[in-house]
């Protein structure tokens, strides 16, 4: 992402306020981009109040010597079959709250590395990184439960830059097979070709970064996976927007967007949807920093949806 673009600090401030919880690991600020600096009041931008949730937590040192937080909701402690959710990018409270709202058999691990999807992609480009992450999560969960833990399925969630980790993980065929579901929260991006040349000026999308998501979407359409993508109307300028990348998926997969007008979680306003098999795209209004954070705050509802597909 070029450094000559002026950073907009609004999303950074809001992310810190919206995702920080008690005794939580520091969250990397978003990389500089260009959401609209406009102040608007047409959407509520509701925020889930941070509070203590029942259940044990453990922390271990993971990729890039960053702390990984593991939370086992109180209702999960006695579950026989466990389901793992690995969340990339964003404070731990929202993912913890999200899994606590599901059936009492989910465990969540939260990974935060640094601003920008490239850091997440490079870190997990070595398949051993994800293998190690899963092994450590299993170890910590087993220690928490005082018994050997095994996971019936794995769901990966990426907010914003966190999609870079999922992209890298899914490139490995064994990991592609291991992952059962993916949830992308306003975080499917790629570069322009040539770099910094928007589509209006003749640029195209770097399709290489999207190929594995096309493959996962095809598997979801066949009913083999579950895949939900949400996006805003933010136009970063220096790299492709989530609207452009989801349009690409729609085109390549031969699908069609349907216009809708309905309320979403946290006061969000949904404008479009795509549904085929177990693959869905939901498009929402908004091109400012708070609209981006809305998608993270709505993780409980979106995670519930992808898990019930």
Regions picked out by a protein language model, each given a short descriptive name:
Residues 1-8:
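Bacterial N-terminal signal peptides that target proteins for export
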Residues 18-20:
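N-terminal signal peptide c-region/cleavage motif recognized by signal peptidases
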Residues 24-82, 267-269:
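A domain-start/cap signature at the N-terminus of enzymes
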Residues 79-143, 268-271:
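Active-site machinery of serine-nucleophile hydrolases
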Residues 147-160:
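Alpha/beta-hydrolase fold nucleophile elbow
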Residues 158-168:
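Glycine-rich nucleophile elbow surrounding the catalytic serine of serine-hydrolase chemistry
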Residues 169-179:
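Conserved hydrolase catalytic core segment
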Residues 183-290:
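The feature captures the conserved acid-bearing segment of alpha/beta-hydrolase catalytic domains
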């Amino acid at each position: 992402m070029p450094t000559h673009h002026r950073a907009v600090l609004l999303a950074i401030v809001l992310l810190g306020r919206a995702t920080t919880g008690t005794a939580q690991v520091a969250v990397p600020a978003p990389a500089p981009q260009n959401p609209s600096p406009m102040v608007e009041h047409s959407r509520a931008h509701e925020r889930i109040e941070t509070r203590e949730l029942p259940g044990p937590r453990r922390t271990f040192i993971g990729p890039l010597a960053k702390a990984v937080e593991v939370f086992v909701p109180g209702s999960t402690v006695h579950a026989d079959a466990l389901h793992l959710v690995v969340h990339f990018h964003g404070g731990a409270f929202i993912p913890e709250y999200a899994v606590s709202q599901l059936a009492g058999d989910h465990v969540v691990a939260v990974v935060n590395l640094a601003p920008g999807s490239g850091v997440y992609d490079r870190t997990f480009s070595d398949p051993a990184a994800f293998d190690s992450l899963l092994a450590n999560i299993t170890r910590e969960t087993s220690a928490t439960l005082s018994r050997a833990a095994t996971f019936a399925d794995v769901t990966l969630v990426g907010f914003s830059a966190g999609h870079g980790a999922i992209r890298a993980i899914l490139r490995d065929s064994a990991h592609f097979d291991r992952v059962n579901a993916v949830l992308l929260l306003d975080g499917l991006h790629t570069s322009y070709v040539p770099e910094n040349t928007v589509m209006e000026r003749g640029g195209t999308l770097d399709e290489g970064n999207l190929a594995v998501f096309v493959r996962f979407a095809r598997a979801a359409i066949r009913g083999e996976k579950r895949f939900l993508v949400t996006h805003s109307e933010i136009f970063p300028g220096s790299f492709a927007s989530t609207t452009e990348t989801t349009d690409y998926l729609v085109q390549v997969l031969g699908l069609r967007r349907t216009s809708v007008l309905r309320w979403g979680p946290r006061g969000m306003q949904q404008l479009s949807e795509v549904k085929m098999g177990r693959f869905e795209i939901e498009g929402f209004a908004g091109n400012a920093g708070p609209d981006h954070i809305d998608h993270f705050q709505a993780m409980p509802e979106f995670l519930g949806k992808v898990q019930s597909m």
